[in-house]
Amino acid sequence: MVVQTLTYGIRLHPSPAESDLLDRTCTAYLSCCDHVSRVAKSNRTLSQRKLNDLAYRHLRETYHVGSQMAQSAIIRVIGNYRTVKESLGDPWKTKRPLQYTSSGYDLVWNRDYSILSDGRLSVNTLKGRVKLQVDWKGMPEQYRHGRFGTARLLKKRGKWMLLIPSTVELTDPQRPQNVMGVDLGMRFLATSYDSSHKTTFHSGKEVTHKRAHYKALRTGLQKRGTRSARRRLKSIGNRENRWMR
């Protein structure tokens, strides 16, 4: 079996009140990320335990987020600084703390979001769970039943989307039983050779003859140089192109 993970963008259709709540939730979440980022850099620590001690209570009391959202912000910031470390060798090499503006709200499967039996999406917000209408056309049926990972809630051009990574198991592709190689040319249009050691030649004699025929016609008409000859040249060119296809 082959395991494959793909991320699909799913369109959400919240009501105006729900959209406003999602806006406020994302703003609070990103503010949490900004605070954790400043704390992590000033204390030069990526320890989840230490960041919990330093930032968790402040996030809950200042931004009025739930426990899971506070933890999600801490985990996201740790992951982002680790990415900086991988690329620069030092997570603290940037002059300023990492900033979070419009990069969305991370949702953990079965904690922050889940799928209801009627296909709607249940999402954790500042005011508890909301149930949203979803357009599932962007995700193939097979991946709708895959193993979902941490999704990201985004607003693009005034429209809400959820980016969902889905992991599925695929059957191994069948190994080909017969392999054929094809060489293209002029004298022989194609020469094929297959796994049973059979060689087949496809002659280009007819094509060569046709090309010579049209070339002779064009040469004669070009020598005339009349208006009717030019119209005839164009007609012949179109006919030759159709024949070659």
Q: What is each stretch, according to the model?
A:
Residues M1-R245:
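Nucleic-acid substrate recognition interfaces
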